[in-house]
Regions:
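Compact, glycine-rich, soluble single-domain proteins
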Residues: 9-100
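Structured alpha/beta interaction-core segments
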Residues: 4-8
Length: 123
């Protein structure tokens, strides 16, 4: 299976880069998945969680909003703010706290924020 290149960038610098099997993005019209060979598109992203599937694990990044450019071979994400949610218990608790702050600052829609936070806490 061909791998997709992905990069997640915020104004402060790069949050994530790598080759992945698939990625699920929080589009404004709903979540959508991207595999190698996807049609070209540019889309707006809403507050949510980017789900990244590598060859041997799943990784998650919370974003407040941004844009994604999708081509056949890569996905480039420019987000206003992002928090990489690490797997370790200490790192995870800190990341969840930072993600919660990021999302609460991004939206006044408490229902949407609560939904995303519930998803993050279940990881």
């Amino acid at each position: 299976m061909a791998l997709l290149k992905i990069s997640v960038v915020v104004p402060e610098g790069e949050v994530y880069t790598g080759e992945v099997k698939s990625v699920v993005l929080p589009g404004v019209e709903g979540e959508f998945g991207v595999l190698y060979g996807h049609s070209n598109m540019i889309t707006l992203l809403q507050a949510g969680v980017i789900e990244i599937e590598t060859e041997n694990q799943k990784e998650h990044i919370a974003i407040n909003w941004g844009y994604a450019e999708v081509t056949k071979e890569r996905v480039d994400i420019l987000a206003d703010g992002a928090v990489f949610i690490k797997k370790g218990p200490d790192d995870r608790d800190d990341a969840i706290s930072r993600a919660k702050k990021l999302l609460e600052d991004a939206s006044s829609d408490r229902l949407a924020v609560s939904s995303v936070l519930a998803k993050i806490e279940s990881l």
